Design a protein with these regions (language model features):
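Flexible loop/hinge segments that line or gate small-molecule binding clefts
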Residues: 1-35, 116, 142-154
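Alpha-helical structural signal in soluble globular domains
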Residues: 2, 6, 62-74, 99, ...
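Short beta-strand elements in bilobed, periplasmic/extracellular small-molecule ligand-binding domains
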Residues: 20, 68-94
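Hydrophobic alpha-helical segments within soluble ligand-binding/sensing domains
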Residues: 25-50, 65, 69, 90-99, ...
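Alpha-helix capping/helix-boundary segments
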Residues: 56, 63, 116-118
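Flexible loop/turn connectors
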Residues: 96-173
Length: 173
């Protein structure tokens, strides 16, 4: 509202929930989450957890919708104890992973809304003697550089930030 009041041109990176009337560019993260559920299902996983960021952020809301769409498409039931939100840091990801893996029916795969949270799973898996990629599958979203140095490297949907920046600049000009 302030930018509009001052007639300052702007664009948004990401959609808003209130459908603000302004130019925006977004990458459809919800499609990635749906595809991730489908991929995990194709590998034999039926109990797939979702670790989300803060649900008040629109990207987190959309990624949750993609996860739920994937479950529904495959005939899998949502289990409330397999969906955690408010996970913003690697330490939060560690705590969320530990909670999920201590459930009476733990997931065999975990989908993370952000790479930062997913990186926390590596410590927990090591502590519990689980091999990521063999005994626990992980897919995440963002493509942060640190993911390439995890062992094994983090499976992630990499965001082309250069392309996003170019699109935003084109919208602004």
């Amino acid at each position: 509202e302030l930018l509009r009041a001052k007639n300052i041109p702007f664009v948004l990176y990401g959609r808003t929930q209130d459908h603000t009337d302004c130019a925006w560019y977004d990458i459809v993260g919800e499609n990635a989450m749906c595809q991730a559920v489908e991929r995990l299902y194709s590998l034999g996983h039926r109990n797939i957890a979702f670790v989300n960021s803060n649900i008040e952020y629109n990207f987190a809301h959309l990624r949750l919708q993609g996860y739920l769409k994937g479950l529904k498409k495959l005939g899998l039931q949502r289990s409330d104890n397999m969906v955690l939100d408010g996970v913003m840091t690697t330490k939060d990801g560690e705590n969320a992973t530990r909670k999920l893996l201590h459930e009476s029916f733990p997931p065999t795969a975990i989908l993370y809304a952000t790479d930062v949270a997913a990186l926390g799973a590596y410590k927990v898996a090591s502590d519990l003697g689980l091999q990521i990629g063999k005994e626990l599958s992980i897919i995440s979203y963002d493509g942060v550089p640190e993911g390439a140095f995890a062992n094994p490297p983090l499976t992630t949907f990499k965001i082309d930030t250069k392309k996003a920046g170019e699109q935003l600049a084109a919208l602004l000009i």
